[in-house]
Amino acid sequence: MTVTNNEIAREFAERLLAIEAVSLSPDAPFTWASGLHSPIYCDNRVTLSDPQTRDLIADGLASLVRTNFHQVDVVAGTATAGIAHAALAADRLGAPMAYVRSVPKDHGRGNQIEGRIPAHSKVIMVEDLISTGGSVLKAAQAVEREGSTVVGVLALFSYELEKGHRAFEKAGVPLYTLSNYPILIEVAAESGRITSEQQATLATWSSDPQAWSDAH
C-alpha cells in the first residue's frame, strides 16, 4: 500500500484528527460491528461536512491520479461511502464518474454499476476507508466483468492491516491513500493528543488486530 506524498499524508491526518473523523482511544477501546475491540474509530463521512477537508480530499485524490496513472477514463466510487469522494475527484479531473453497488439492484434494470462505464475503459475505484480491502476489490471485479480494467484504487485512509496488503497484492491492483494509520498515530503523538506510551500501544494493533482485541 502506498502513500505518495508524505506532506499531504500528514496534513490529512491532522485534519482527520481535528474534525474528529478519527478517534483514538487505546485505554477504552471501541467495539466494532464485527465484535472486535479496537483503539481507533474512523468515520470519514464527517469529512463531507467540512469544506476545508473536502478541498484537501478533492485536490489530494486528483493529485494521486495525475502522479500515478497515465490514463484514467472513469472514476468510480463504491456505494455508498466512496460515492461523494469519487465525485470530488472526478470533478477536479474533469472525468466521468460512476458508482458500483455491493450487489445488483433487485428491481428495475438490476444494475450493479450506476452511471456509464464504457467497455474497455481504464477505471479508478475510490473508497473512503481500507481495512481488508474486500469491499472495493469486489466492486472492482464487477467493473472488470463488464469489460473494463481497474487500474488502481484510491482511498482516504488505510489501517495498513496485513490482510489488506495481501488482498491487494493477490488482486494485482495498486492502492494509493491520502494517509494511513502509522502516519496518523505519529501526528497524534507529535500534537500531544496521545502519550508516547499510548502511541506504542496503538502501534501494536495493526500488526494483529485480533490478538490486540483479545488482550483488551
From Swiss-Prot:
Residues annotated as binding 5-phospho-alpha-D-ribose 1-diphosphate: R101, K105, H107, E127, D128, L129, I130, S131, T132, G133, G134, S135
Pathway: Pyrimidine metabolism; UMP biosynthesis via de novo pathway; UMP from orotate: step 1/2
Reactions listed under catalytic activity: orotidine 5'-phosphate + diphosphate = orotate + 5-phospho-alpha-D-ribose 1-diphosphate
Record flagged with keyword Glycosyltransferase: yes
SUPFAM superfamilies: PRTase-like
Positions bound to orotate: S131
Keyword Acetylation: no
One of the GO BP terms on file: 'de novo' UMP biosynthetic process
Necessary cofactors: Mg(2+)
Gene Ontology molecular function terms on file: magnesium ion binding; orotate phosphoribosyltransferase activity
EC number annotated for this UniProt entry: 2.4.2.10
Keywords, sorted A to Z: Glycosyltransferase, Magnesium, Pyrimidine biosynthesis, Transferase
InterPro entries referenced in this protein's UniProt entry, alphabetically: OPRT, Or_phspho_trans_dom, PRibTrfase_dom, PRTase-like
NCBIfam families: pyrE
Family: Belongs to the purine/pyrimidine phosphoribosyltransferase family. PyrE subfamily.
Quaternary structure (record): Homodimer.
Described purpose of this protein according to its UniProt entry: Catalyzes the transfer of a ribosyl phosphate group from 5-phosphoribose 1-diphosphate to orotate, leading to the formation of orotidine monophosphate (OMP).
Protein name: Orotate phosphoribosyltransferase
Record organism: Cutibacterium acnes (strain DSM 16379 / KPA171202) (Propionibacterium acnes)
Gene name of the encoded protein: pyrE
